[in-house]
């Protein structure tokens, strides 16, 4: 069965897609990262105010509500929220959304195929950097893809209690990851730069993937700090002890990583371990900490 199933794009849609291929992704992303770290005083505050107004950012829920309290754009973008701004569902069987944003797609993995958008599919193997053992664990499992827009809170949290087993940095493209491009660029999430985090949980393995994008200057985790930059040209794998004093245990709702400018989070679950909440569907806005699945194993 073919992995491609695309609608015929219009002329202007083809132009938009072509621009993504021609766009100098890495230089622009590096420039954006540099600019976001500059301390320009009133200029920085003015830019933050314009950005917050343009994207309707809710600063009332942030610890710092005044744009003048941020010294850099990145500090604003990584703003922590007030305590209890995102209550975590405490039901032991609840699996919670890892980030604010919007659901791009969710559902069952068909053998090794995941839905990208409207008939676009990609495989576990390509997404997981050809780690066949990891891919095998999630065949016929469940997945959810969450898109973080520029307005959203950009720290990423744990959907359940887990212990870190492996992290893989995968170099790649930096295509934008909005819904339009997800419908028109084949294998988008499997082509973009990403950080794959594999965890052990009470119901088996779980993967949480932080996918990079245009102007996503860096991806970080709480245990390793900033993963990129610098950007390796090779896949880099890190393995962790899951027992003993050096093991990294994280609780449901704990922060695990962050983006500096928006992108996408993908979660994978093994077959017959979780049941997705029936009312969730593509396009639904999400709040970190809300239940999106129930543990059934």
Curated annotation (Swiss-Prot):
Is synthesized initially as an inactive proenzyme. Formation of the active enzyme involves a self-maturation process in which the active site pyruvoyl group is generated from an internal serine residue via an autocatalytic post-translational modification. Two non-identical subunits are generated from the proenzyme in this reaction, and the pyruvate is formed at the N-terminus of the alpha chain, which is derived from the carboxyl end of the proenzyme. The modification Pyruvic acid (Ser) is found at residue 263. GO terms for cellular component: plasma membrane. Pathway: Phospholipid metabolism; phosphatidylethanolamine biosynthesis; phosphatidylethanolamine from CDP-diacylglycerol: step 2/2. InterPro entries: PS_Dcarbxylase, PSD-B, PSD_type1_pro. Its main location: membrane. The record marks 262-263 as: Cleavage (non-hydrolytic). GO terms for biological process: phosphatidylethanolamine biosynthetic process. It is a peripheral membrane protein. Binds 1 pyruvoyl group covalently per subunit. Its cofactor is pyruvate. Heterodimer of a large membrane-associated beta subunit and a small pyruvoyl-containing alpha subunit. Belongs to the phosphatidylserine decarboxylase family. PSD-B subfamily. Prokaryotic type I sub-subfamily. This is Phosphatidylserine decarboxylase proenzyme. It comes from Haemophilus ducreyi (strain 35000HP / ATCC 700724).
């Amino acid at each position: 069965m073919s992995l491609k199933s695309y609608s015929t794009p219009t002329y202007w849609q083809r132009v938009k897609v072509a621009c993504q291929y021609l766009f100098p992704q890495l230089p622009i992303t590096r420039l954006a990262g540099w600019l976001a770290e500059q301390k320009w005083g009133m200029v920085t505050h003015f830019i933050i105010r314009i950005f917050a107004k343009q994207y309707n950012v809710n600063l009332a829920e942030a610890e710092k509500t005044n744009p003048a309290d941020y010294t850099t754009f990145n500090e604003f973008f990584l703003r922590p929220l007030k305590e209890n701004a995102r209550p975590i569902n405490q039901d032991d069987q609840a699996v919670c959304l890892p980030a604010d944003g919007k659901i791009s797609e969710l559902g069952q993995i068909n053998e090794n195929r995941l839905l990208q958008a409207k008939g676009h599919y990609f495989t576990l193997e390509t997404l997981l950097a050809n780690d066949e053992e990891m891919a095998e664990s999630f065949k016929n499992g469940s997945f959810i893809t969450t898109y973080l827009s520029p307005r959203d809170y950009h720290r990423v949290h744990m959907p359940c209690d887990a212990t870190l087993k492996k992290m893989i940095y995968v170099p790649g493209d930096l295509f934008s990851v909005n819904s339009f491009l997800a419908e028109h660029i084949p294998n988008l999430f499997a082509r973009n730069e990403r950080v794959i985090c594999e965890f052990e949980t009470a119901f088996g393995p779980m993967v949480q993937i932080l996918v990079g994008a245009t102007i996503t200057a860096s991806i970080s985790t709480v245990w390793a700090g900033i993963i990129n930059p610098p950007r390796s040209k090779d896949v880099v794998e890190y393995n962790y002890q899951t027992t003993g004093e050096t093991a990294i245990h994280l609780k449901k709702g704990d922060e695990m990583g962050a983006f500096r400018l928006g992108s996408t989070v993908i979660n994978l679950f093994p077959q017959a371990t979780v049941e997705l909440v029936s009312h969730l569907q593509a396009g639904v806005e999400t709040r970190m900490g809300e239940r999106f699945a129930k543990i059934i194993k």
